Amino acid sequence: MSGKDVNVFEMAQSQVKNACDKLGMEPAVYELLKEPMRVIEVSIPVKMDDGSIKTFKGFRSQHNDAVGPTKGGIRFHQNVSRDEVKALSIWMTFKCSVTGIPYGGGKGGIIVDPSTLSQGELERLSRGYIDGIYKLIGEKVDVPAPDVNTNGQIMSWMVDEYNKLTGQSSIGVITGKPVEFGGSLGRTAATGFGVAVTAREAAAKLGIDMKKAKIAVQGIGNVGSYTVLNCEKLGGTVVAMAEWCKSEGSYAIYNENGLDGQAMLDYMKEHGNLLNFPGAKRISLEEFWASDVDIVIPAALENSITKEVAESIKAKLVCEAANGPTTPEADEVFAERGIVLTPDILTNAGGVTVSYFEWVQNLYGYYWSEEEVEQKEEIAMVKAFESIWKIKEEYNVTMREAAYMHSIKKVAEAMKLRGWY
C-alpha cells in the first residue's frame, strides 16, 4: 500500500482503538474518542490583487476538551483535507496528554498553496479564516498555533483580527507568535529540540552512542532544521538529508563525513533547495531511506514511510518528528524487525509543550528566559519518554502503543470524572 492510499483519519482511529483494546477500556471510551467533538468548515472569500474574488476552503477540528481547551496548529497547504485535520486533532489530544499539559486536541487548515499568494493576499486570507471561526476559539476554548507553511507573522495577523472582532486584548488566543508580540523565547526551536532530546534518550536505551551516531533526516523546514542543529549539538552526524522542491519533486543528498546543518540552512535560504549543496552527492529517495545510519528522522508530511520503505531501513531507531509519517503496515514491519520507533505524539511534543508555556506566560504576563524554557521543556520530554518506555517494557508493546496507552488512560479518567460515561 502506498502512502497516498492511506486515510490518515482511519489510521488515527485504528491507533486509538488498538490502545483502548490493549488497556481493556470500556467501549464508551473509544466511542467518545473516535470522532472530533466539533469540525468547522468555512468558505473564505479573498480579494485578490487583481481585484477578483477567490474563495478558499478552511477547516478547524476540535477533538476533545475533557482535560482543557483544545490546542493545535493551522496549516496552509494544497493537500489539506477535512479528514487530515480530524486525524491531526486526534493526535494532538494524545500529544498534549503525553507530556501532561492541560489541553485537548485541535487542528486547522486551509486548502491553498501559499507560494502563489502575495503578502497582501496571504494577510487577507489569514484574517478571513479567523472571521470564520472566531466565535468558536479563545484562550480558554481553543488555542491555534503555526503549522505547515504558517509562521509568527500569520499568527500575529490572526490575533489582531480576533481582538478586533471580539473587542478584547487577548494575545493568548494563539501561540507561536513573535517574541515582540507575546511569543515565548525558545518556541521557534522547541519542536526540533524536543526531537533531539527524544532521539538521545531512545539511543541511550538501545546502546547507540549519540556522539558517534549517523543520522538521516527527511525535511529541512522548521522542525527538520532545528532537529539537525540540536542533534549536532549532542554530537550526532547528519549524513543524509531528503527534501522536496517544485522542479525536482523529492530528492536526497548524502555525505558520509556529515552535512553541516547551518551551512545547509544558509544554502537553502539562498538557493531554495539543496540540489547542488557543496560536498554532497545526490542520491535517490530509496537510497536515502536505506542509507547506513543509526537513526532515521522523518520530519516532512504524513505517510512518508510505507511498508516498502520500512523494509529497506537499516537504522535501529526511527524518531517521528513529523505527524503521522509512518503507515500502519510500516509500523508492523518495524515491530517484526525489532526497530524501535518513537511516535509523533511523543517525539514532536516539544512544540506544543512550549506553546503551553507561551500561553501560561501570556495569561500571567510574566516571561521566562530562553534557558528556563529549554530546561522546562527538556524535563517534560524526558519524563514523558521514561513513562512511555516503562509501559513499553511492562506490557511488551511498541512505543506507539505505549504512548497511546499512557495518554488515553489520562484522558479517559478526565472524561469519567466529568460524567461523560
UniProtKB/Swiss-Prot annotation:
Stored CDD domains: NAD_bind_1_Glu_DH
**InterPro entries in alphabetical order:** Aminoacid_DH-like_N_sf, Glu/Leu/Phe/Val/Trp_DH, Glu/Leu/Phe/Val/Trp_DH_C, Glu/Leu/Phe/Val/Trp_DH_dimer, Glu/Leu/Phe/Val_DH_AS, Glu_DH, NAD(P)-bd_dom_sf, NAD_bind_Glu_DH
Reply yes or no: does the keyword Glycoprotein apply.
no
Q: Which residues bind NAD(+)?
A: 191, 222
Q: Which residues bind substrate?
A: 71, 95, 355
Assembly state and interactors?
A: Homohexamer.
Q: Which family does it belong to?
A: Belongs to the Glu/Leu/Phe/Val dehydrogenases family.
- Site residues (Important for catalysis), renumbered to this chain: 147
Keywords, A to Z?
NAD, Oxidoreductase
Enzymatic reactions? L-glutamate + NAD(+) + H2O = 2-oxoglutarate + NH4(+) + NADH + H(+)
Q: Where is the active site?
A: 107
Q: Name one GO molecular function term.
A: glutamate dehydrogenase (NAD+) activity
Its Enzyme Commission number(s) read 1.4.1.2
Output the GO biological process annotations, alphabetical, semicolon-separated. amino acid metabolic process; glutamate catabolic process
Q: What protein name is recorded for this chain?
A: NAD-specific glutamate dehydrogenase
The record ties this protein, via Pfam families, to: ELFV_dehydrog (PF00208), ELFV_dehydrog_N (PF02812)
- SMART domains, A to Z: ELFV_dehydrog
